[in-house]
């Protein structure tokens, strides 16, 4: 009897132990994924590992916004705003399906610290700093607000304004996975659930001792350059490796509550919360994502508290005119994470930490050939990838394809080919509305293979869990090629199902049991029980949800 074929993940774990790499990237969030994709596409022998799943920390907890940082204008960080606006524009151009312009409908309260006219001027400055790439801002009268967004409560308002930024129609973690997929396609050895136990210098190399948390196997990964892209965990990783840096992180906790859609307009609603911070209601499929908070955190391990929920619900209920106030019973799901904010290692310089920006700093030790990525956010990921390539070159890594494009969707002709094929086979009649657009957005050129699967078996076009907006063929593709190890990887990161379907509805769904069967075979029932906490995970999987 022949052995079963090895999974994509198993193949990559083997590569990690057998090959020597130019660069090993620790941490598979947005910074690590963009770095690995850029390096691999340009010809470096790159490797990427994460202690948990890809994008399982900060990169799965954002507002799903791709924005130029309009709030940083208040701190006069004009250069940063211009840079972020350009980064946003580059993502809009490169990912026209995955990153979309969205209008922000902002109301203004009488007596706010900045008068309405000044905020309107700020929105025009923001538009100009972005090169006029998006639709122009406009002033909103109370009549405009009442007509266009009747859900907004008018009490205490004297008007508002509207401007543009961008957002991710799917989810942040899926965007990160697609960058990991790009890295894999260019030859990167990448694997999730590979824990770095420590790194040391041996001659001209870094030797990183790691453990495959699935098999328990220990391995040594050799690289010329070591990149720490562990986000909020980066300081601890550096300390364990004996690396001193001029920067460090302070952490800010932010939470979001997801509820049934509060407006059908497709806009993001923007308010100033009671603490003066920007406060959003962002579309998320059939739901709305409301937040965020900004509180200091001592550790990356955070959770939503009763006080957090109360703050978000009280603020949104004050500002919306709903049939009844939102309560905790209306919460479909929650998002909670920390923002790693970069400061000088000697301290934050006495500056109000709430005024710290999401800028990134890439710090390199040319003697040790060690690089740390501090701070950052999804909007800036293309800059991080480019700067990491520049830094790798300075550290002696050859990039034979230095001009190779490493990001973006397939060109318009490939997109048209896919939609023509979807039309010819009558996908709209076989699948829920919008399926073609979602498949292209999530899989790019690979979506043609999913159409072929549907052609062979029409049941592959069926939605697997009601309201989850995921087709059976997507589950099958995840089982084949998306390194799904735990059920949470699929429900929370490869898809947004766990964010738009209530947990109790997932538990009772026959479709979810079928998802587990496709993903895990005979082990599906055990994975399902682990996900809902009905049984404890076995020892080899007990630590999966901890730090990278």
Model-identified regions with their sequence ranges:
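Core beta-strand elements of the Rossmann-like FAD/NAD(P) dinucleotide-binding domain
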Residues: 19-21, 216-225
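C-terminal catalytic lobe of FAD-dependent flavoproteins
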Residues: 172-178, 182, 244-289, 295-433, ...
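Helix-loop-beta segment of a Rossmann-like dinucleotide-binding subdomain
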Residues: 146-186, 207, 221, 293-300, ...
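A conserved short coil-to-beta-strand element within the FAD-binding core of flavoproteins
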Residues: 192-206
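Flavin (primarily FAD) binding-site architecture
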Residues: 228-243
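Dinucleotide-binding Rossmann-like beta1-alpha1 core, especially the glycine-rich loop
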Residues: 64-148
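Glycine-rich FAD pyrophosphate-binding loop
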Residues: 40-60
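Extreme N-terminal leader/targeting segments of oxidoreductases
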Residues: 1-23, 38-42
